[in-house]
Amino acid sequence: MENFQRYFLMFSILIFSYFLLIRWDPPNENSSENSISIDSERPLINDPIDFEETAPFNENLSNIKAIDNVCAANNIKTLESPYWSLDIDLKKGEIVKTTLKNYPVEIDSKGKKILFNKCGPEKYSHTSGFEFLNKELNPDKNFFSVKETYTSDNKIFVVLEKTEKNLLFKKIISYKNDDYFVSVTDSVLNVSASEVTLAPFSKIDRSSVDLNADENSIFNPASFAYLGPAFQTSSDNYNKISFSDLSEDNFRELSTKGWASMLEHYFISAIVPEEGTNFIFQARKSTKSDVFSIGLVGETNSIAPNREASFNQKVYFGPKIKKELQKAHPELDLAVDYGWLWWIGQPMYSAMSFFHNLTGNWGWSIVLVTILIKVLLWPLSMVSYRNM
């Protein structure tokens, strides 16, 4: 019995020390944005580009007429894969709806899970493009059109184009049939006689409406699961920022890597930019409605006549399945919150996935993981039995 108590005490000290270590946050001399060295001759935007202040972000989402225009589906391009369908509003090239074909709303339900849903109470959408600092545009008059669609290297490419004020905009959306993300390349060609200054941006909008809020029950995990933004940046692998926190203060952080995501219980949407480029990751609440914007803004860039600027990203919209998330980004699976026992949860999930691939049944996977844990803990159990 004494040996068992000794082992238990040692184990408790180790666990306590571990949590003390991961919670310790040493002073960071280079924590401020101004102190980060930037290997680029092009400066970042001196004055913060605020989502609410830029042209693509100043739409009043409480304006019913504006939302009805999107819901009328007069200018919608629909993309299809075996896994999902995706609706693009050609006015802005905005993703306004995604339907996940393999996930019913409820068991035995014919209705399918809708993630992006600008016309629903969530006001959930994704937009990307360029913000111009010395040129005003009117996107309501110039819509994108489908220039071409083709297949190459098992990927489907859809090319959207529009011209406005001597600027040629192009949005190339590519995807594979077995992925839950699309690759998006936004580009603009300056065909005017003068230089233009711009910055790329990408953002996800969503209200704080929780569709599971009316189903509060200990038997419905979705009713009390986290709903809100999460980021990965150069300084933090996983940073949850709740809607309540954003109601009090905005989030801004300079980073050359990472992603911005919007989480719910079983599903996630995320923006994954190319690494190695300076971005300011942002999140804020609209001053006009209960809509929160998360995303990123890139460096300012001056484009000479007949020159082009481009911006590459991936947009994920699908289930929290590790192998699917890692297709979009090797560390996007960190968005799956295992809680404070993640160091136990992650290997257990990996073991369950391994056994599921062998048996094709989650029930047997749980049984086999239980047996595996019993085998691994047998030496400790044997010691405790001897000292009883």
Stretches found by the model and what they are:
Residues V375-M388:
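Juxtamembrane interface at the cytosolic side of transmembrane helices
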Residues M1-I371, V375:
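Membrane-protein biogenesis/insertion across secretory and organellar systems
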